Amino acid sequence: MRYRLAWLLHSALPSTFRSVLGARLPPSERLCGFQKKTYSKMNNPAIKRIGHHIIKSHEDKREYRGLELANGIKVLLVSDPTTDKSSAALDVHIGSLSDPPNIAGLSHFCEHMLFLGTKKYPKENEYSQFLSEHAGSSNAFTSGEHTNYYFDVSHEHLEGALDRFAQFFLCPLFDESCKDREVNAVDSEHEKNVMNDAWRLFQLEKATGNPKHPFSKFGTGNKYTLETRPNQEGIDVRQELLKFHSTYYSSNLMAICVLGRESLDDLTNLVVKLFSEVENKNVPLPEFPEHPFQEEHLKQLYKIVPIKDIRNLYVTFPIPDLQKYYKSNPGHYLGHLIGHEGPGSLLSELKSKGWVNTLVGGQKEGARGFMFFIINVDLTEEGLLHVEDIILHMFQYIQKLRAEGPQEWVFQECKDLNAVAFRFKDKERPRGYTSKIAGILHYYPLEEVLTAEYLLEEFRPDLIEMVLDKLRPENVRVAIVSKSFEGKTDRTEEWYGTQYKQEAIPDEVIKKWQNADLNGKFKLPMKNEFIPTNFEILSLEKEATPYPSLIKDTAMSKLWFKQDDKFFLPKACLNFEFFSPFAYVDPLHCNMAYLYLELLKDSLNEYAYAAELAGLSYDLQNTIYGMYLSVKGYNDKQPILLKKIIEKMATFEIDEKRFEIIKEAYMRSLNNFRAEQPHQHAMYYLRLLMTEVAWTKDELKEALDDVTLPRLKAFIPQLLSRLHIEALLHGNITKQAALGIMQMVEDTLIEHAHTKPLLPSQLVRYREVQLPDRGWFVYQQRNEVHNNCGIEIYYQTDMQSTSENMFLELFCQIISEPCFNTLRTKEQLGYIVFSGPRRANGIQGLRFIIQSEKPPHYLESRVEAFLITMEKSIEDMTEEAFQKHIQALAIRRLDKPKKLSAECAKYWGEIISQQYNFDRDNIEVAYLKTLTKEDIIKFYKEMLAVDAPRRHKVSVHVLAREMDSCPVVGEFPCQNDINLSQAPALPQPEVIQNMTEFKRGLPLFPLVKPHINFMAAKL
């Protein structure tokens, strides 16, 4: 695939050509800017410039205005009278590249500290509490060049939130006690990443360049860099924070995006009032004209040992900063070709040789002044033995591009694809939208900020050739990641401990690559037949319903249909679940269902890639009930792709070589689960404990040896022999077309796979374990990789119903912010602290998830202590405060989906849970508004208090790798620490030694009854 900006270097942490833009409409008809109100800068000396003509999509109904304040802050205002949430973001064009050399992570630490009190609002959780009480949320991130802060809040409370937010940049406190505690949060955040291959590889890339270049810095920071070493060197970190903020948090390096229901004039006045006082220190914009990879860092090979059993090849070329060429984007053009996955592509040839599975290519951001061009592949076992040959093929393909020269029709196709994507772009959630815009305001003229990353305007063959000229063997760096290098390395990266070996690439290998000749198997892509040409929005049918309606109900299928009446874009979502009793009957069958679909997707890749480029994607995966298929995007060519997928499903022939490769990759992925985070392990074990049937990773690994090619070939017709299909077709589609699509799916399966219907008795869902009253169970396991503990504590409450859902959700709303403030900010238990509802198979409860260096039984005691404090907090809560929480939860629940796929996902969730409560939000919010404080206190005392008669609790304790054992319960007196509330004395829990025996001894809940009476709903 073409490398996209969101994709990191490493996997985490995808001519006579007809125009599709309405016969090349003039710009005034394709795109439009607003100038509905004439707001003159003469009205206010705080405004230096106003940009009225923000170019936007014709489909975008929001109003925009750009501002440059007198102090240099760039602003984009977005007036959206329909938004449920308002949002704002501020991006400071400073990041970890500007950290002082002796305090690594200071910019990141500064980001953390700004949340913890300001002169105007000194209470350290004032900002988060205000947002929580008004259905809001916030976050921030620090990168090499940016520190980005953002929030959302109910639309009525934008001004209050923005006022608190603005103080971050005017007068933060950097309180000493907060500083001492928050350094632990940064350290915990780093500790979470230490055994993560994505973070390790990123830091190693930085560490193997010029050590004097800012790119080489350790950006996250940890306790050593932010406390221990500064103390040793006599550095006052609080003073350094104040100095960093006063130096770099300058208005001329800031950009703001604000989105609200208010008019543009009101938004203008609000921003001017709150941000015009931010001081302009005229800080020069940091630029890095020298590339971190100089001649001595090129023609180098790095052999790297990963934590997980992965095999990757990273080929990197230093290139100049191409940012200023955004209107022609030569990196995009080359990434499109080198990263192509169709017939004749580089990936196609490498896969045919059995050397790689995936490929990503394209430009990668560095910082102002430098970039990289990357070609990354996932290696097979055979591919690891042919790295030189793989890179030779890369240079053969690059040579093909040189020989062909820049092709204007390819550029035109990219231009048209991007223009369609921009014109029919889905509406984003406000928080993500403002954060992104604030970040890119630094790079583009105000008028072009919405279009710059989409619209291509100038075909510049000279720039394409300039970048192509950088993709040469003498300009290359190569990194190979494989467990096979264990014990063969001689270097260790400082911050993450990554083991690696550095070697110069031999001259004869460089010469071999330089002499790469043309490979006749490489071809430029064919013209993309999936680019949509019909963008007609269909008229709403007379019988259109506000929610999905059942338009077909037979022994073979249930078809739900909903014509889009909200978004009016030429898109649709087609969701199918194929129920089969053979898909999950045992670990062997689960493995075979997985491999069948992985091989199927692998064989479809060349065909479906063109559709993906044209905005039409599909997802296919095995589930515990069978198979799930979704096809999303422009509806014009959607049936063509769907038909191809179903035909392939029904007639699939397995390629033996790909079978062995994908089976081996699957085994590695099962083994790699051991290296997931402790909190993820805790969630995994809890699911195994609570679900009636769930196969473990170990059971799947053991059964995988029994999956042979003949056995898998025999399994596929068995899987397809009897099915029940439940589908939701939703979007720019008619009822008749939906029925036709469903008939095509059924006919194809019947014709090629001789599929017959399932019996109704075979459509029963799995159920959830029912915990006994006053029961407390503990399950303990150890994580072999990470040096942190993880815990999930689950208080099972009851079956889902309108009343039970609202009791639980309102309680979660009330405790959410205090939980974070108490357990993370004040007690510093760890970076990951979460509370909220857990729902599975119609059963629900309250859960806490924590990852920490502290032992699980201590975390358990702190959660219990916190719950006791919340009982008093709720009892003492004023009616006004209680009603704020009800209103906040109501706003969250009634927050409208921003795009078709999000609305479809809500409806699909109702269908696959077999609850079918499509109007759930309105029904439950109406009930929510009747609740009283006494209802919640009663819910707590009955279900959650230590002595509650209907308390049902299970805890999963995941021990750190260096812990051999740990008590499941303990007492931790807090008299010596006045900041800690006293934990209750806990009874001795029942320790689960065997999952099967645990489940065998307990009853199961019944399934939740559907909201719809299907006998009445039948046509």
From Swiss-Prot:
What processes does the entry annotate via GO biological process terms?
amyloid-beta metabolic process; antigen processing and presentation of endogenous peptide antigen via MHC class I; bradykinin catabolic process; hormone catabolic process; insulin catabolic process; peptide catabolic process; protein catabolic process; proteolysis involved in protein catabolic process
Note on cofactor:
Binds 1 zinc ion per subunit.
Q: According to the lineage, what is the superkingdom?
A: Eukaryota
Q: Where does substrate bind?
A: L359, V360, G361, G362, Q363
This protein's cofactor list reads: Zn(2+)
Record-listed ATP binding positions? R429, D895, K896, P897, K898, K899, L900, S901
Quote the InterPro entries the UniProt record gives. Answer: Metalloenz_LuxS/M16, Pept_M16_N, Pept_M16_Zn_BS, Peptidase_M16, Peptidase_M16_C, Peptidase_M16_M, PqqF-like_C_4
Q: Name one Pfam family in it.
A: PqqF-like_C_4
UniProt short sequence motif SlyX motif, positions renumbered to this chain: 853-858
What is the annotated localization of this protein? Cytoplasm, Cytosol; Cell membrane; Secreted
Q: So what does this thing catalyse? A: Degradation of insulin, glucagon and other polypeptides. No action on proteins
Main EC class the enzyme belongs to:
hydrolase
Role played? Plays a role in the cellular breakdown of insulin, APP peptides, IAPP peptides, natriuretic peptides, glucagon, bradykinin, kallidin, and other peptides, and thereby plays a role in intercellular peptide signaling. Substrate binding induces important conformation changes, making it possible to bind and degrade larger substrates, such as insulin. Contributes to the regulation of peptide hormone signaling cascades and regulation of blood glucose homeostasis via its role in the degradation of insulin, glucagon and IAPP.
Free-text domain note: The SlyX motif may be involved in the non-conventional secretion of the protein.
Its quaternary organisation is: Homodimer. Can also form homotetramers.
Q: Which family does it belong to?
A: Belongs to the peptidase M16 family.
Q: Which PANTHER family match?
A: INSULIN-DEGRADING ENZYME-RELATED, NARDILYSIN
- Under which name does UniProt file this protein? Insulin-degrading enzyme
Source species: Bos taurus
Q: What is the primary gene name for this protein? A: IDE
